[in-house]
């Protein structure tokens, strides 16, 4: 019985083996086809990769261009709000001017448009806007400022200090020169002038001398806020005249200065007067210098003013 079972099993295996072989051959054929198809699909994917990459780059470029166009359109809309363009063609001409300028100056068109908006809002005449924008854009590039920042800074100088456009451009050149030759960055110095330039000019300084004195205070390591406070305190003290306190007047008399005469001298030769006062302080014994400075200009300005006594050369930049 067992022998019969074995032979029966072997016979059954023989009967099944043929069909199974055919099935296996068919499966191998399918597997080969699938492998070939997979290989072909892989090759196709490899071939299409550069195309997909190029398409992605193109879509990104189109998206970026669209974004820039929208930013420019928005910026020019702001210009139209503050500048009275009499005709649409006049507005389009300004658009072209801005685009041309963006091709010559490394600043985006919407940044230049922001400068024009700031200038228009501050009262720069329409016929002067293009020149103002070009000068401010160049300043912005040199000072590492955005169009918004450059436009506001230059507009604030002009309006606050009552400067002509040539004076504004000359001031920008002076700030650039000072920042290249002293320990004072152009943005920080520009901010100091924005804060207290008008006050310092009333005290007798020209716009470029305001910049020089501001740079001298900054070079001692003062922040723009501290330097601006020191500049305001220093210059207004020298022109107080009869409004000077008794203790202040006594401190100046100990240096050989009359409060009323000093106020007059500031209007004639502010830079020379400032230099004489600081030189007189520097000539005093060191143990007296800080008490005199505190009495004359106040505690909050010491950090910016005191270092000048050791480096008077900063005042002649």
Feature-to-residue mapping (PLM):
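Extended alpha-helical or coil "stalk/linker/tether" regions that are enriched in polar/charged
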Residues: 212-317
């Amino acid at each position: 019985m067992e022998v019969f079972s074995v032979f029966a099993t072997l016979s059954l295996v023989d009967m099944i083996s043929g069909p199974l072989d055919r099935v296996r051959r068919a499966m191998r054929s399918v597997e080969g086809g699938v492998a070939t198809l997979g290989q072909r699909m892989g090759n196709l994917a490899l071939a299409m990769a550069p195309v997909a990459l190029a398409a992605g780059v193109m879509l990104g470029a189109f998206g970026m261009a669209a974004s820039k166009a929208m930013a420019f359109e928005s910026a020019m809309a702001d210009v139209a709000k503050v500048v009275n363009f009499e005709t649409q063609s006049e507005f389009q001409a300004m658009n072209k001017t801005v685009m041309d300028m963006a091709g010559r100056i490394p600043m985006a068109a919407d940044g230049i448009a922001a400068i024009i908006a700031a200038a228009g809002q501050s009262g720069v005449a329409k016929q002067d806007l293009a020149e103002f924008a070009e000068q401010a854009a160049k300043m912005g590039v040199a000072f590492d400022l955005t169009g918004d920042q450059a436009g506001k800074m230059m507009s604030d100088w002009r309006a606050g200090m009552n400067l002509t456009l040539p004076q504004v451009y000359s001031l920008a050149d002076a700030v650039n020169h000072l920042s290249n030759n002293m320990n004072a960055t152009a943005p920080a110095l520009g901010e100091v002038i924005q804060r207290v330039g008008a006050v310092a000019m009333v005290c007798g300084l020209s716009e470029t001398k305001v910049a020089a004195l501001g740079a001298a205070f900054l070079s001692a390591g003062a922040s723009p806020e501290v330097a601006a406070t020191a500049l305001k305190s220093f210059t207004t003290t020298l022109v107080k005249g009869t409004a000077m306190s008794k203790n202040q007047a006594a401190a100046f008399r100990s240096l050989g200065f009359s409060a009323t005469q000093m106020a007059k001298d500031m209007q004639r030769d502010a830079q020379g007067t400032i230099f004489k006062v600081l030189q007189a302080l520097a000539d005093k014994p060191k143990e007296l210098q800080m008490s005199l400075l505190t009495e004359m200009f106040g505690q909050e300005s010491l950090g910016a003013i005191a270092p000048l006594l050791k480096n008077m050369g900063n005042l002649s930049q």
